Amino acid sequence: ASPATAGAYCVMDAQTGEVICQKNAYTRMEMASTTKVMTALVALENAPLSLTVRITRAEAGTEGSSMYLRAGDVYTLEDLLLGMMLVSGNDAALAVARTVAGSEASFVRLMNEKAQEIGMCDTHFDNPHGLHSQEHYTSAYDLALLCGYAMQNAEFCRIVGCKSADIKELTSGETRVMVNKNRFIYAFEGADGIKIGYTRRAGRCLCASAGRDGKRMICVLLNDADWFASAAELLEEAFKNKR
């Protein structure tokens, strides 16, 4: 099976790291909001979920997809991670980065160190949200490696597997519901995460994870207009062949 529509894809056995099938998997590409997989992982490894975060004016005004944070709002790190992974809040990504590392630049350094540690040889991060930058790229293979690694983190798993979550602004006590924009988790048997992304330049990007019969498969698609159908086709095939 080879979804012709994808710029690149990589299907990986999460347990062994074996590449089941791929297309252009080692080509450097733009990744859009799938960046936030690394943002969430670095945050989870470096700060407690209960940490409280006060939102700045700059963060509240971030361009692109948003969880609509307002300056002065206070949230737990956990709720910001939910907003970042479920509705792809760029505002949340910046607030998380500043809180965890002191500044966006310091956080990005942590992202790149982690990428090296995992063995992501064709990846460089320039920001925590994935908006376009010349210096911000990955490959389908590298992202699949990252997803396999991240899904070993129980908190990460729980967050990206949420179909929806109630988040609470702590000064007002006001709660809102965040519904996961990653439709793949509703559509594919065994699907349990991870993240979608889209910019005009990167196209539609999807990192998907699914578990069946004790096996976990990761599927990464970059620049694929038919992302959900392609992922379903590739993962079905992978599970069939791994029986």
Model-derived regions, located:
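Active-site-adjacent loops and short helices of periplasmic peptidoglycan-processing enzymes
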Residues: 1-141, 147-154, 212
